[in-house]
Amino acid sequence: MRHPLVMGNWKLNGSRHMVNELVANLRKELAGVTGCAVAIAPPDMYLDLAKHAADGSHIILGAQNVDVNLSGAFTGETSAEMLKDIGAKYIIIGHSERRTYHKESDEFIAKKFAVLKEQGLIPVLCIGETEAENEAGKTEEVCARQIDAVLKTQGAAAFEGAVIAYEPVWAIGTGKSATPAQAQAVHKFIRDHIAKADAKVAEQVIIQYGGSVNASNAAELFTQPDIDGALVGGASLKADAFAVIVKAAEAAKQA
């Protein structure tokens, strides 16, 4: 039985005051929520502060990126060992902003996936097509290629306990969102694609939707059978909006 997971990706936003205030408000808004796992991914600078602010709550600490190296002369990087040491659990990799701005390849992202698994951390593998690829009918081809970078090097078993976040690039931060039916079709394709290698693993892998998820569209998205939660950007910076999304996931999956 898959459990829903809603994760907030704070991106390049935050301050000490903001972290303390947002986490305190999240604790209030999410008190009593038990049917949906909740994670937040602040900038690395604020991971320790967020961890202490969330102590004693059900909020799980995550991070936005990881390096493929565990230590050494790699200026500016953060290793899986460091993230594990500070208490982060869910680690985002392959986000379209990393793929675009930092030219991260499918193969490089697959190496990050492997490093996280080796350290006992949970990869949140972001996949998704650009607007041009979508218009060219290449959505499934792109998603399959991005998944295959892991499947072909680590096997289907690598996805056991992992998370995939389908984020159509054309919907991130644009206000556009795939319709629930469109998102469900891609999520089903992703699950079926993994099932070709291992049906049992495919059935349990959590597949989140990410792409302008907000308080108004969350409930309908979560009624879809293969949408197991959300990776939330802008709305995760507002406790009330984020809480609506979490509660929508909880309600939909308990129905």
From Swiss-Prot:
Kindly list the places in or outside the cell where this protein is found, as annotated in its UniProt entry. Answer: Cytoplasm
Q: What class of enzyme is it?
A: isomerase
What Gene Ontology terms describe what this protein does at the molecular function level?
Answer: triose-phosphate isomerase activity
List the pathway annotation: Carbohydrate biosynthesis; gluconeogenesis; Carbohydrate degradation; glycolysis; D-glyceraldehyde 3-phosphate from glycerone phosphate: step 1/1
Q: Name the keywords, alphabetized.
A: Cytoplasm, Gluconeogenesis, Glycolysis, Isomerase
Alphabetical GO biological process terms: gluconeogenesis; glyceraldehyde-3-phosphate biosynthetic process; glycerol catabolic process; glycolytic process
EC numbers listed for it are 5.3.1.1
Catalysed reactions listed for this entry: D-glyceraldehyde 3-phosphate = dihydroxyacetone phosphate
Question: Subunit info?
Answer: Homodimer.
- Put simply, this protein is called Triosephosphate isomerase
Organism this protein belongs to: Enterobacter cloacae
